[in-house]
Amino acid sequence: MGTIQTLPGTRDILPEEIGYWQYVETVATQILSRAMYYEIRPPIFEQTSLFERGIGEATDVVGKEMYTFSDRGDRSLTLRPEGTAGVVRAYLQNNLYAAGGVQRLWYCGPMFRYERPQAGRQRQFHQIGLELIGTADPRADVEVIALATDILKTLGLQSLKLDINSVGDRNDRQNYREALVNYFLPYKAELDTDSQDRLQRNPLRILDSKDKRTKEINQNAPSILEHLGDASKKHFDQVQQLLTDLGIEYNINPCLVRGLDYYTHTAFEMISDDLGAQATVCGGGRYDGLVEELGGNPTPAVGWAIGMERLIILLKQLQSSPDMTPDIYIVSRGEAAEGQGLILAQKLRKEGLTVELDMSGSAFGKQFKRADRSGAIACIVLGEEEATNKTVQLKWLQSKEQQAMTQAELLTKVGELIEQLDRHKRTMNHSTQ
């Protein structure tokens, strides 16, 4: 009987990779916390109507990509395909607006879409996202862009391109939709199949087509920027000026429309050419009509989401990985020594040291080889003699220096030990540069 495998479009995140994920989450948490964004954790599945109303029934996400099922109460439920709709639902259901002012929220977790799996695109994928709800001020648009930039640059990504556009307000978009339909109709037979389907349903998405002939037709399509009203133009001009004031470089891309119906005014993407076809690492924009669409009062908002799988592909290319090696590796042999090793490991961990305890029970020679491979700075050795005398041998793995001490001395000198570990780390780092 064969082993059970993961489903297409899903994958295990294994221990050797998890350090990247924890690194990204830690950096994002630190930066967003400093900007007074609070984490929120909505459910992974919601009523299907939330996404039909929030994302738009005419979108590819709702029409083709959602994982939808009926539960035993015959309710239609959907695994969330994105995070914003659930956050807005939570904002309304839990009266987060009652405090007044703006709400700064962020989330992290898995999303689900039925797509063709490829590098950087999975059917279960993960996002870090934020939402700034309650203000139409262009400074909010720029604040969230600046925070995404800070996160990505702190992680070591420097060669990113920021594309921005304005998709205007509802009236602007309606006028633009009509202009697009009139432009594309004579070319209908030349458009790819998906774009033909989108022509009446969601013509803005034709601008995002990857088909070669459709892209050629798009080159002469009307620009959304030519259909913006005065208020939309003013908002977009202010966003550009504020980005310039912050020293954030950007490129205006009139074809940038994003894939969800709720976007208004500013839309943006952060792009890396290192990812091939799946180039967008972060995408977002303003969605001033979504709160009202989901039953609330008219409330402006802006947000983004970072795709973690794509981001981690980039981090691996940069070899930008956190240090996941132990400070100390404990080897022991014999029942009494192994028990004392466990106790020492726990006590040293409580003092803030990273400790790996060898539990193989194999000969010292094999344990020492594993200690060398672990990347640890020092090794604590416990044999039968050490167990009897309540002593240890502390061995520095790079210099091979070794010193004997009692277990009590080891624990009382943890501060000195940490200083010694730091010195050895600096020596090792210097020798590898």
From Swiss-Prot:
It is an enzyme of class 6 (ligase). Its EC number is 6.1.1.21. It catalyses: tRNA(His) + L-histidine + ATP = L-histidyl-tRNA(His) + AMP + diphosphate + H(+). It is found in: Cytoplasm. Keywords: Aminoacyl-tRNA synthetase, ATP-binding, Cytoplasm, Ligase, Nucleotide-binding, Protein biosynthesis. GO terms for biological process: histidyl-tRNA aminoacylation. One of its GO terms (cellular component) is cytoplasm. InterPro entries: aa-tRNA-synth_II, aa-tRNA-synth_II/BPL/LPL, Anticodon-bd, Anticodon-bd_dom_sf, His-tRNA-ligase, HisRS-like_core, HisRS/HisZ, HisRS_anticodon. It comes from the Bacteria. Its main location: cytoplasm. Transmembrane segments: none annotated. One of its GO terms (molecular function) is ATP binding. Belongs to the class-II aminoacyl-tRNA synthetase family. Homodimer. This is Histidine--tRNA ligase. It comes from Crocosphaera subtropica (strain ATCC 51142 / BH68) (Cyanothece sp. (strain ATCC 51142)).
